[in-house]
């Protein structure tokens, strides 16, 4: 009876370790999937001020040309 309990405990322990390793791999895969999204946000942050600067330069000229009130 003792050997049966010992082997069952060993199987439970190994199964628990295997399950935790699978969860770690799953978390690592999710982190890898998140990286491109973070890179997209960084790219947006870099280009947004440039676009705003260009718009600030040309909007008054365009508004002046449309309304002809310069």
UniProtKB/Swiss-Prot annotation:
Question: Which cysteines are cross-linked by disulfides?
Answer: 64-70
Share an example GO biological-process annotation for this protein. Answer: killing of cells of another organism
In which broad location class does this protein mainly occur, judging by the first location in its UniProt entry?
A: secreted
Q: Which UniProt keywords apply?
A: Amphibian defense peptide, Antibiotic, Antimicrobial, Cleavage on pair of basic residues, Disulfide bond, Fungicide, Secreted, Signal
Q: Where is the signal peptide?
A: 1-22
Tell me what this protein is called. Brevinin-1PLc
Similarity comment text for this entry: Belongs to the frog skin active peptide (FSAP) family. Brevinin subfamily.
Q: Does the keyword Disulfide bond apply?
A: yes
- Please give the superkingdom of this protein's source: Eukaryota
Give the UniProt entry's GO cellular component terms: extracellular region
Gene source species:
Lithobates palustris
Q: Could you tell me in which tissues this protein is expressed?
A: Expressed by the skin glands.
- Name the job this protein performs: Antimicrobial activity against the Gram-negative bacterium E.coli, the Gram-positive bacterium S.aureus and the yeast C.albicans.
Localization terms from the record: Secreted
Task: Please give the residues making up the propeptide in this record.
Answer: 23-44
Asked if the keyword DNA damage belongs to this entry, the reply reads no
């Amino acid at each position: 009876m003792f050997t049966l309990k010992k082997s069952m405990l060993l199987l439970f322990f190994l199964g628990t370790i295997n399950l935790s390793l699978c969860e770690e791999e799953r978390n690592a895969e999710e982190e890898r999937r998140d990286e491109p999204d973070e890179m997209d946000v960084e790219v947006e942050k870099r280009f947004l001020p440039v676009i705003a600067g260009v718009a600030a330069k040309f909007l008054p000229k365009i508004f002046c040309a449309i309304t002809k009130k310069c």
